[in-house]
């Protein structure tokens, strides 16, 4: 099995219903919210805020690494391999170009997809890369730059499928 554990603390707070936090979804509402901030959870007595635990400078209050990609053996419960994934290249809280991306291990929003060819694709980090890994050993096979962060599970097609 493939997992992408995150080691970044988040702060969640229950928010009672009231102005700005209605019980029912407004008729003109678009979408369901964002990854952070207030999560409406319509139909229940409380909403919830979800935000990373950050310093006043906007940086996490825990040292890196924050994100990994790993393979698990479901029969033995062993971690087969575990690699840091993601760079801070496109996710600094203020404009700071980092010319040489270094693999720090960043939080992810999105998931991987695996193929019959034993290749795992993932674009869930905020550093605007799509990456391919060998599922057997975790070796990075390829990475390509995206115009923006993927934050989603890639899609795969089969020729003549």
State where each predicted segment sits.
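Beta-sheet-rich non-transmembrane sensory/scaffold domains
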Residues: 1-161
């Amino acid at each position: 099995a493939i997992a992408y554990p995150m080691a970044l603390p988040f702060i969640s707070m229950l928010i009672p219903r009231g102005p700005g936090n209605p019980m029912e979804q407004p008729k003109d509402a678009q979408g369901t919210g964002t990854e952070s901030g207030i999560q409406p959870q319509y139909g229940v007595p409380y909403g919830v805020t979800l935000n990373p635990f950050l310093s006043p400078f906007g940086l996490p209050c825990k040292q890196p690494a924050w994100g990994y990609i790993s393979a698990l053996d479901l029969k033995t419960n062993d971690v087969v391999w575990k690699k840091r994934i993601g760079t801070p290249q496109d996710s600094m809280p203020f404009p700071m170009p980092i010319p040489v991306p270094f693999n720090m291990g960043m939080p992810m929003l999105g998931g991987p997809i695996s193929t019959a060819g034993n290749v795992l694709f993932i674009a869930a980090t905020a550093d605007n890369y799509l990456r391919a890994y060998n599922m057997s050993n975790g070796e990075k096979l390829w990475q390509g730059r995206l115009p923006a962060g993927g934050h989603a599970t890639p899609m795969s097609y089969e020729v003549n499928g």
